[in-house]
Amino acid sequence: MLKHQIKITINAIKKIKKLLLKKKNFKLKLRIFITGGGCSGFQYGFELEKITKKNDISIIQSGIEIIIDPISIQYLLGGKIDYIENLEGSKFVISNPNAKRTCGCGLSFSI
């Protein structure tokens, strides 16, 4: 059910698969989390992890797994996870309908 409430683009899936290939470990999962900080109050974090914690929410799509803790998931529902490459660099980007403001770099937001 959650996979329909958080969209993962093809570009994000391809990048996650490349990261797993580089690490030579397809059992790793991409953890997405929200922490306090940044110029707008909250910021996104991304890490590859082996272990899913007891209360984590797991989203499996196209052979990759994304895990999100129960507190972060409430701020991400309805969002879209993408991966972009442009003149500024390359990065995962979250389009978040719950964010009232974002900073200029797009790395932090407020609710």
Curated annotation (Swiss-Prot):
Source superkingdom: Bacteria
Protein name in UniProt: Iron-sulfur cluster insertion protein ErpA
Keyword Metal-binding among UniProt keywords: yes
Cofactor entry: iron-sulfur cluster
Cofactor remark: Binds 1 iron-sulfur cluster per subunit.
Source organism: Buchnera aphidicola subsp. Cinara cedri (strain Cc)
HAMAP family: Fe_S_insert_ErpA (MF_01380)
Function of the protein: Required for insertion of 4Fe-4S clusters for at least IspG.
Keywords, sorted A to Z: Iron, Iron-sulfur, Metal-binding
Complex formation: Homodimer.
